[in-house]
């Protein structure tokens, strides 16, 4: 039986035991504080036109995202009105959640080992970094996560996943994520 007081997520332990040393050797860091680490993971579901037609869609997306993340997601709202799209200011448009600490490592583990292999025609993720060491990716169907019961889903949503790191360059961030077994296709 797991002892909750002594529990450490698998990827967090792997980072402390092997990944830090490998990155220090690979990039020649002189100080341990220079070694890149994961800062946060932001998950976002945008409902778009569906939320305009039915306000319950954003609530449904929020509930699904809360199940996936393991913590309560917040509803995102429209910043301004756009008459052409029938969008009003403060209208619910989706949901987002920011993961840090142990939940972040647990989510990354589930994403890489469980959800990604379940994606249809999966050939790896495109290495899309922002130039400052942050990685962004999209998933077309949120139902690839085991927390979502396919029979109870009223709508299949796409999802944005942003992994923020303390890396200064894209090469450092890519190496960090590769050590976590992120399956890049190039």
From Swiss-Prot:
One of its GO terms (biological process) is translation. GO terms for cellular component: ribonucleoprotein complex; ribosome. One of its GO terms (molecular function) is rRNA binding. Pfam families: Ribosomal_L5 (PF00281), Ribosomal_L5_C (PF00673). It comes from the Bacteria. The keyword Cytoplasm does not apply. InterPro entries: Ribosomal_uL5, Ribosomal_uL5_bac-type, Ribosomal_uL5_C, Ribosomal_uL5_CS, Ribosomal_uL5_dom_sf, Ribosomal_uL5_N. Keywords: Ribonucleoprotein, Ribosomal protein, RNA-binding, rRNA-binding, tRNA-binding. Gene3D superfamilies: 3.30.1440.10. This is one of the proteins that bind and probably mediate the attachment of the 5S RNA into the large ribosomal subunit, where it forms part of the central protuberance. In the 70S ribosome it contacts protein S13 of the 30S subunit (bridge B1b), connecting the 2 subunits; this bridge is implicated in subunit movement. Contacts the P site tRNA; the 5S rRNA and some of its associated proteins might help stabilize positioning of ribosome-bound tRNAs. Part of the 50S ribosomal subunit; part of the 5S rRNA/L5/L18/L25 subcomplex. Contacts the 5S rRNA and the P site tRNA. Forms a bridge to the 30S subunit in the 70S ribosome. Belongs to the universal ribosomal protein uL5 family. NCBIfam families: PRK00010.1. This is Large ribosomal subunit protein uL5. The lineage of its organism: Bacteria, Pseudomonadati, Pseudomonadota, Alphaproteobacteria, Rhodobacterales.
